[in-house]
């Protein structure tokens, strides 16, 4: 983080996500008050007092830990108003500050026994299992108190390090160790639960294991080699991030700020609360009960059962339903855990951070715009007037059409011709960005020149559809207006659709006709079997130029699939080039007429072409005329 800027906001170079140590977790939530008291640990499961409706001290909404629930007011009411800013009340210990600190101040729960982090234990792949080089099933047996694991073999010759033992097997070994005739001096050490897992992870020397793995990889092959590489990769990542494997076992749990898991009073006096509060409450209750059982030296079986329950409560808090039975609330609805809040389409990242609403943007259904140029898109007038409103207001005032913003807005609401004229001037040369989710590659966002259209749908050129993976069956697209002149320049130079013809991934053309265009081209050039071919000289079906055919089509004197004779002087390709004409006739003036299947040529005495009529369909005339025009425009 750079410290060069002395303003209130901090400028970050990057955000790094890595494992947090137990000390770091406690550091997040711990604060030392001016009187020397350290606060931050949440020890009580209570939320608010049902009589006073104020947060309970040391509870999940504690004002001493998280800050006051009312601006500039302590819990007991001794200090009120902003003039007491920064004072810590000597009676209740609450700092007099703004209530918004409750959105970022954290707390923590110090656990009476370590618990495994369910993401690293039950994730795919399981990092704990990979690091320990043990099957996931065996690691689970240890964590959930089904099996003991050997941590130190001592003098025993029958045991192996990391060997799993059932309750009965361990009892037998214990009997041998403590028998009168036993020769074992160094007793083997076994463990169970997350404490044993933590011990196994602490025993790992990552650098030595990595060195050994590199030697083994050099001499192994196949499935075994792939497994070793997988383990080495995980170990190298731990070394690179300076994280210790035992941090995957939690000694303290962070408690997120109370305003991010609120409790709201409803009209009937009842309360609606975030599911996280219920999950935190389960953890605190079980943690306190475990601490009490350890204090009174309760039997091992009871303590172990409570530790397992604590492990399950923490699992449910972090990722409810990942392992074991899903914790449900009222009306059998699964409670939303921290993972549920973060992950998925409706999660914090995709919904609230990446997908947040922005100014100067809109969204609408897309329809095909066949008359558009490739770099253009049809923008509905209603949408354009809203997106470009500040620009329109500025221009209306500058042109002295109105005197102030209020008058300009009234004029815009009427949407008369004057406003539309100004809007047309504003959007001229101002590119807009179109984006279709999901944006899987850079061509998912492209720039276009807007053209005002009637209706409420955005019109899109059919050739750019493959880049967006869009079709016209109800897809929606978002519109964004680049504001800065640099952004507009970048959009025009780099992002314009006509500049993005090749795929950045493969280099192949991405602007290819597909779907409607292929079908349309086929329909346009298709021949109807039952259509009658006219004889040459039939006045009603003979035309002097391609333009005459198009004019006749526009006047609805002919249809797309009608056969016509049309005079054409350009190059043609024909299937019967190598064959002889069907009929050849020399006229009195020395010119020769040649009749072929689909054309009729008139040649002079030297064999040079005087005129040519071709037999074709109206649709093919439309197709060829369009292509000839396009080629002429680019050359």
Curated annotation (Swiss-Prot):
One of its GO terms (cellular component) is DNA-directed RNA polymerase complex. GO terms for biological process: DNA-templated transcription. GO terms for molecular function: DNA binding; DNA-directed RNA polymerase activity; magnesium ion binding; zinc ion binding. Binds 1 Mg(2+) ion per subunit. Binds 1 Zn(2+) ion per subunit. Mg(2+) binds at residues 471, 473, 475. InterPro entries: DNA-dir_RpoC1_gamma, DNA-dir_RpoC_beta_prime, RNA_pol_asu, RNA_pol_N, RNA_pol_Rpb1_1, RNA_pol_Rpb1_3, RNA_pol_Rpb1_3_sf, RNA_pol_Rpb1_clamp_domain. Its cofactor is Mg(2+); Zn(2+). HAMAP family: RNApol_bact_RpoC1. DNA-dependent RNA polymerase catalyzes the transcription of DNA into RNA using the four ribonucleoside triphosphates as substrates. NCBIfam families: PRK02625.1 (NF002729), rpoC1_cyan (TIGR02387). This is DNA-directed RNA polymerase subunit gamma. It comes from Prochlorococcus marinus (strain NATL1A). The gene is rpoC1.
